[in-house]
């Protein structure tokens, strides 16, 4: 068996990535989220495949086909809710994974980090298009509002929006192409994940101390395979509690009303995992400015390696930047709350303050905190 594992051209690659991979001996449970994201991706592809067997991407029958899946297909309700809530678990793991990367300075592995940002954009695009497919009220109006943002692009905006819609409004052509893209993107994401891993294995994993761990490595299997398995069981437990007890808690009741272009819902809002970005978008009165802020809210992550001022890699021994980090986390929670609120006083002003704070903490306060900590270190 050892001979096959180490000599076979294909199994050898798997061996170097998941079995004999030298891993730092001290990585904590915060390093579990990579494998959990892989598990989420597998769950989403499998449940999505079975849903696609029964779904019809036609405006006349899309809503009915989803109802048919839940009512008539064997375990269709289970597959549907695993897919919908699986997306939420996916984003919870994503946010924790990115948060871990920021906390422990993993963004200094620039290729891996940038690949991760591309993956984040790809997953967000996939989730957005998936939300349109059930063709409920929030599906239709969410698609209309978000795609319409592209009309803010000077000169080509309006043409671009009509090109994406395949007509003069969100209609049959839009739904069909969104289904096609929603189906193909997870496979593109899988390919990007392999590139992400390729870049990671060039440098090796970071660890909670932020120090070089070459002197103290252990094999990935069995130590981290068993640790990842525990994480996977906890993820599946959380997912199944959500699916079997509270399947609709994260959804919008409006999406149980079939799409009606003549009736606008009182509050158009995306799924919970986009609310922070939606709040940033809404906090700027100008359309183009809002779109730019929306894109920058994610793209700003690419600046993090260049905004790193500290002599230390992670925040483990940096109390001032730690404080800034947790204020940033609280700020993102405030933005998520504001994104789900109506556009009225005092929510507008809170959203604007939280949006300014978000960018200021990342671009100004965290780098300054790093410099102050350097000075304190030099005083020693």
From Swiss-Prot:
Its cofactor is heme b. A ubiquinone binds at residue 201. One of its GO terms (biological process) is mitochondrial electron transport, ubiquinol to cytochrome c. SUPFAM superfamilies: a domain/subunit of cytochrome bc1 complex (Ubiquinol-cytochrome c reductase), Transmembrane di-heme cytochromes. InterPro entries: Cyt_b/b6_C (IPR005798), Cyt_b/b6_C_sf (IPR036150), Cyt_b/b6_N (IPR005797), Cytb/b6-like_sf (IPR027387), Cytochrome_b (IPR030689), Cytochrome_b_C_euk/bac (IPR048260), Cytochrome_b_N_euk/bac (IPR048259), Di-haem_cyt_TM (IPR016174). GO terms for cellular component: mitochondrial inner membrane; respiratory chain complex III. The chain crosses the membrane at residues 33-53, 77-98, 113-133, 178-198, 226-246, 288-308, 320-340, 347-367. It holds the Pfam family Cytochrome_B. The keyword Mitochondrion applies. Component of the ubiquinol-cytochrome c reductase complex (complex III or cytochrome b-c1 complex) that is part of the mitochondrial respiratory chain. The b-c1 complex mediates electron transfer from ubiquinol to cytochrome c. Contributes to the generation of a proton gradient across the mitochondrial membrane that is then used for ATP synthesis. Belongs to the cytochrome b family. PANTHER family: CYTOCHROME B (PTHR19271:SF16). This is Cytochrome b.
